[in-house]
């Protein structure tokens, strides 16, 4: 049935009128695999059409106890993020079963136990000293530093300070750069490269220079002509993947003398938002560059520094009377 679901989702569009991404379909199938494995271990006979509300409630309770409770702060419960995601990812399977097999969807029942998403916290904004030290750990843009890995890592850290999400950074291609104009083009992750919704990202002068240096060393890489993607891996590998980016950021933080547990690629997005807000860039401009449609995102990013920005803004007025 999961193969049927895969085929079904591959031929329809989502609620936004766009084809489902492969990673989204895989997430839905993974949820189905988790349910199937639990049914097998619990000696529940039959396929997914035997799942009623009671069965799903048992499954979600088991998943919550096994996966979410250990992640809670006190180890006794309270965190429900994993179960909430699993519930949402299983819904398409039961929608499909309702359409194709006339199986009543447990999701339509008020008796289904629903696990809420945990409240969003305030991600930590990186300090100016942290970013500066990490850039120094990658050669600080010195023309005397010419080895591929250091030049690449420095350029990547620089691009992260421009507010790109990890997947947006990894999806960049050489053709997306316009270094003469100090801009780059970012294609929305769930759209094709012909979309009119691509965003133009303004680059800091040092970021443009770091990218120019990277392009020079990239040309010497054995995979330079084998992939259109901008960032190349090490040891003759092709395009850089998320795991490589994650390890890179952690390693460079450690090289700079910081606890790598305190940083992830996405930390730079919040830092970028705080930098622009503190500099007085309008919320409208920040939303346009970042591609946000909702002001809620503007409030969330850099939220941990909101009080500091407010104090500095008021103090900057000096004596008012």
Model-flagged regions — what are they?
Residues 142-146, 247-288, 307, 316:
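Short, basic (Lys/Arg/His-rich) helix/loop patches that form interaction surfaces
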Residues 133-166:
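Basic, Lys/Arg- and aromatic-enriched nucleic-acid-binding interface segment
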Residues 160-181, 284-288:
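Short, charged phosphate-coordinating catalytic segments
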Residues 176-179, 260-262, 281-301:
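Short, polar N-cap/turn motifs at the start of nucleic acid-interacting alpha helices
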Residues 4-23, 29-121, 137-144:
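N-terminal core-binding DNA-recognition domain of tyrosine recombinases/integrases
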Residues 192-213, 226-249:
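C-terminal catalytic core of Y-nucleophile DNA break-rejoin enzymes
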Residues 171-210, 296:
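Conserved tyrosine-mediated DNA breakage-rejoining catalytic core shared by Y-recombinases
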Residues 188, 192, 290-316:
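Catalytic-site neighborhood detector that most strongly recognizes the C-terminal catalytic loop/helix
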